[in-house]
Amino acid sequence: MTILILTDNVHAHALAVDLQARHGDMDVYQSPIGQLPGVPRCDVAERVAEIVERYDLVLSFHCKQRFPAALIDGVRCVNVHPGFNPYNRGWFPQVFSIIDGQKVGVTIHEIDDQLDHGPIIAQRECAIESWDSSGSVYARLMDIERELVLEHFDAIRDGSYTAKSPATEGNLNLKKDFEQLRRLDLNERGTFGHFLNRLRALTHDDFRNAWFVDASGRKVFVRVVLEPEKPAEA
């Protein structure tokens, strides 16, 4: 059995290389817009016929390129998504889950013609703590993702799983929805809890996500640091 893994994510690429070393007979590529150094590129839109003929399974590990219908119809395609489908499907699930309180986790699912939507093969929830930021939740999601893929890989490879459709359609967030969160309106009214959730949702390592414009017209970037109190020693 020959498998194609497509990934644009450094963490997922490490997992793909691990699977390749363990199981062999796999090719690992990034999409045309990927930025992984030294990883060959594959434009699935231009190579559908070749992929369908050559591979028995296509795995998307955070691949940013949408799969054409002809590819989905021609070969089994499975996606590994860092979200708990059907909640906050699409762009940066943990960001929106910190804000709206919906579940977050990792979902392995068959790919259909909609985004993060197909029948679910396996999934695992990740808790969000009051002191979490997008970055800290995402780090745990990557650990869960690795565990879940390794646990279910044999079934994914062989197709010996039972997939189930999501109970509801859920909701979908696109890149434009994330971009709308980034600019902070200093005159916006609301609770401090709401604003804190938004700031920690936009805090992700060194990324300059949240910003406001000060009185001089200068853009000012904002991150928050949350540190839980250590439990008292007995």
UniProtKB/Swiss-Prot annotation:
Q: Where, in this chain's numbering, is (6R)-10-formyltetrahydrofolate bound?
A: Q65, R66, F67, D112, D116, K175
Tell me the null mutant phenotype: Mice infected with M.tuberculosis H37Rv mutants for Rv3404c present a highly significant increase in their survival time as compared with mice infected with the parental strain.
Task: State the InterPro entries in the record.
Answer: Formyl_transf_N (IPR002376), Formyl_transf_N_sf (IPR036477), N_formyltrans_C (IPR040660)
The GO cellular component terms are: cytosol
- Is Nucleus among this UniProt entry's keywords? no
UniProt keyword terms in alphabetical order: Carbohydrate metabolism, Transferase
Q: Could you state one GO biological process linked to this protein?
A: conversion of methionyl-tRNA to N-formyl-methionyl-tRNA
EC number annotated for this UniProt entry? 2.1.2.-
Q: Which domain of life is it from?
A: Bacteria
| Classification via Gene3D superfamilies | Formyl transferase, N-terminal domain
Q: Provide the active-site residues from the annotation.
A: H81 (proton acceptor)
Q: Which molecular-function annotations from GO does this UniProt entry contain?
A: hydroxymethyl-, formyl- and related transferase activity; methionyl-tRNA formyltransferase activity; protein homodimerization activity
Which residues are noted in the entry as dTDP-4-amino-4,6-dideoxy-alpha-D-glucose-binding?
N9, H62, C63, K64, G90, W91, F92, P93, Q94, N209
Q: Which reaction does it catalyse?
A: dTDP-4-amino-4,6-dideoxy-alpha-D-glucose + (6R)-10-formyltetrahydrofolate = dTDP-4-formamido-4,6-dideoxy-alpha-D-glucose + (6S)-5,6,7,8-tetrahydrofolate + H(+)
| Keyword presence, Transmembrane | no
Annotated Pfam families: Formyl_trans_N, N_formyltrans_C
Also noted in the record is: Was identified as a high-confidence drug target.
**In which family does this protein belong, per the annotation?**
Belongs to the dTDP-Qui4N formyltransferase family.
Assembly information from the UniProt record: Homodimer.
Q: Give the protein's biological function.
A: Sugar N-formyltransferase that catalyzes the conversion of dTDP-4-amino-4,6-dideoxyglucose into dTDP-4-formamido-4,6-dideoxyglucose using N(10)-formyltetrahydrofolate as the carbon source. Plays a role in virulence. Has no activity on dTDP-3-amino-3,6-dideoxyglucose, dTDP-3-amino-3,6-dideoxygalactose, UDP-4-amino-4-deoxyarabinose, and GDP-4-amino-4,6-dideoxymannose.
Q: What is this protein called?
A: dTDP-4-amino-4,6-dideoxyglucose formyltransferase
